[in-house]
Amino acid sequence: MIKGIGLDIVEINRLAHVLSRQPRLPERILTLNEQDIFHALSEKRQLEFLAGRFAAKEAFAKAYGTGIGRHLSFHDIEIQKDEHGKPFIKSEKTKDDQVHVSITHTKEYAAAQVLIERLSS
């Protein structure tokens, strides 16, 4: 049974502008593991990576039903890749659920969709 669906889109240039004013933004959004990956990337790829992760975490928060705030933080959500490069979400908040995620980006935008599926009744 579907528990929630979330969708988010981020304008990459807008995120770049915020990042120029708030250089610690990646630390607010990314887990320590994600930060390690972020810092190993070129500057262009860093923006795409950060925008994609931000969109995925916002989409997850919408699917979860609370948004980012008191009950769910960016650090409660980690996007990892499987052995084939497919992204998946790791979160203690949905350990009994199946979470599906799709992340995409163009030169201008990053977008993500998340579906949370309840596995047990």
UniProtKB/Swiss-Prot annotation:
Pfam families (UniProt xref): ACPS (PF01648)
Keyword flag Disulfide bond: no
Top EC category: transferase
GO function terms (MF aspect): holo-[acyl-carrier-protein] synthase activity; magnesium ion binding
GO biological process terms, semicolon-separated: fatty acid biosynthetic process; lysine biosynthetic process via aminoadipic acid
Listed InterPro entries: 4-PPantetheinyl_Trfase_dom, 4-PPantetheinyl_Trfase_dom_sf, ACPS, P-Pant_transferase_sf, Ppantetheine-prot_Trfase_dom
Localization per record: Cytoplasm
The enzyme's E.C. designation: 2.7.8.7
GO CC annotations on file: cytosol
Residues engaged in binding Mg(2+): D8, E58
Catalytic activity: apo-[ACP] + CoA = holo-[ACP] + adenosine 3',5'-bisphosphate + H(+)
Cofactor: Mg(2+)
Alphabetical UniProt keywords: Cytoplasm, Fatty acid biosynthesis, Fatty acid metabolism, Lipid biosynthesis, Lipid metabolism, Magnesium, Metal-binding, Transferase
Gene3D superfamilies from the UniProt entry: 4'-phosphopantetheinyl transferase domain
Domain of life: Bacteria
Primary localisation category: cytoplasm
Family to which the UniProt record says this protein belongs: Belongs to the P-Pant transferase superfamily. AcpS family.
Record's function text: Transfers the 4'-phosphopantetheine moiety from coenzyme A to a Ser of acyl-carrier-protein.
NCBIfam families on file: acpS (TIGR00516), pantethn_trn (TIGR00556)
Name under which the protein is recorded: Holo-[acyl-carrier-protein] synthase
Phylogenetic lineage: Bacteria, Bacillati, Bacillota, Bacilli, Bacillales
